[in-house]
C-alpha cells in the first residue's frame, strides 16, 4: 500500500545558492498536502506543470535549483513537506544531495496516511536528439548513461536499484561541468556557489580536480533525474528507468507524461 510521508520534525540547512552564490537558509517542515516551496510570499507546489525553467537547473515558479533536494525527498519517500527559503534558490551545499539526505535521515520521517497508488500504466518514452528516457513499470532498476561522444570521457553508465542503493551509489555525486563551459557560465551568472570541491570539472583529456568515483558525472545525472521525476510522485521502486544523456528538460517532460496518468492530481 502506498502512503503519504513527511519529515518527522523541522530541518534547517544553511548554505549558498548553487548558482547565485548568495547565503541563504532553508527550512523543511512537516506538512500534509504535497511538497510545497515557499519564498517571499510565493508558494509553489512541486509538480511538473509548475516548472518554469530547465536551463542548468529545475525551477518551480521563481524558485530555482530544486532537483537535489527533490532527489533526496524521493529516496526517503517524502511526498509532503513545506520548504521555506530566505532566497529563491535551494542551497548548493557540496554540489550533491548528500547533505539533504543526511538531514532528512537525522530528522526521520512519519507516515501521514494512505496515498493513491502511483503505478506506471505503460511505457513512457521521451526522446530529443541524443537524449532518451524510457520508463516502464518495474521494481526500481535504474540505468543512466552520461555520453560525451568522442570527447573525453566518452560514455559512462551507472546502474542502481532504488531507493535502497541511493545513499551508497547516488547521493554523494556532485554536479559536473565541462572546463570550456566555465567562462560562459560565469558570464551568465551561474555556478557562483560552487568551487573545486563541490563540482566535477571535466577537462579535454581528464578530470581537472579530484573525483569521488571515475563515473561520478553519470551518478550525478542519475541524481538529477530522480529529483525531476519525483515531481510526478511515482515511488522509485515501482519504475524501471533507462536514461541516455538525460537533462532537466527531458526529465521534466518525462515527469509530465507520468503525471498525466493521474488527472485528478491537477496543478494548483
Predicted regions located by residue number:
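Short acidic-hydrophobic catalytic motif
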Residues: 1-268
Amino acid at each position: 500500500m502506498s502512503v503519504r510521508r513527511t519529515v518527522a520534525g523541522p530541518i534547517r540547512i544553511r548554505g549558498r545558492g548553487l548558482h547565485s552564490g548568495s547565503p541563504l537558509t532553508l527550512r523543511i517542515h512537516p506538512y500534509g498536502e504535497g511538497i510545497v516551496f515557499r519564498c517571499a510570499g510565493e508558494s509553489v507546489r512541486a509538480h511538473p506543470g509548475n516548472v518554469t525553467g530547465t536551463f542548468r537547473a529545475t525551477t518551480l515558479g521563481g524558485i530555482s535549483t530544486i532537483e537535489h533536494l527533490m532527489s533526496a525527498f524521493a529516496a526517503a519517500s517524502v511526498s509532503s513537506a513545506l520548504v521555506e527559503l530566505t532566497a529563491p534558490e535551494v542551497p548548493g551545499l557540496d554540489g550533491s544531495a548528500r547533505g539533504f539526505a543526511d538531514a532528512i535521515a537525522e530528522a526521520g520521517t512519519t507516515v501521514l496516511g494512505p496515498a493513491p497508488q502511483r503505478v506506471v500504466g505503460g511505457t513512457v518514452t521521451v526522446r530529443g536528439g541524443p537524449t532518451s528516457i524510457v520508463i516502464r513499470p518495474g521494481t526500481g532498476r535504474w540505468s543512466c548513461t552520461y555520453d560525451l561522444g568522442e570527447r573525453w570521457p566518452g560514455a559512462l553508465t551507472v546502474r542502481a536499484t532504488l531507493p535502497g542503493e541511493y545513499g551508497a551509489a547516488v547521493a554523494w555525486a556532485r554536479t559536473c561541468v565541462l572546463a570550456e563551459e566555465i567562462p560562459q557560465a560565469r558570464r551568465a551568472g551561474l555556478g557562483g556557489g560552487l568551487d573545486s570541491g563541490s563540482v566535477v570539472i571535466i577537462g579535454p583529456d581528464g578530470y581537472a580536480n579530484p573525483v569521488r568515483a571515475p563515473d561520478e558525472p553519470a551518478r550525478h545525472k542519475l541524481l538529477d533525474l530522480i529529483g525531476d521525476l519525483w515531481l510526478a510522485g511515482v515511488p522509485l521502486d515501482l519504475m524501471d528507468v533507462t536514461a541516455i544523456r538525460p537533462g532537466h528538460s527531458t526529465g521534466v517532460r518525462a515527469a509530465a507524461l507520468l503525471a498525466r496518468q493521474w488527472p485528478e492530481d491537477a496543478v494548483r
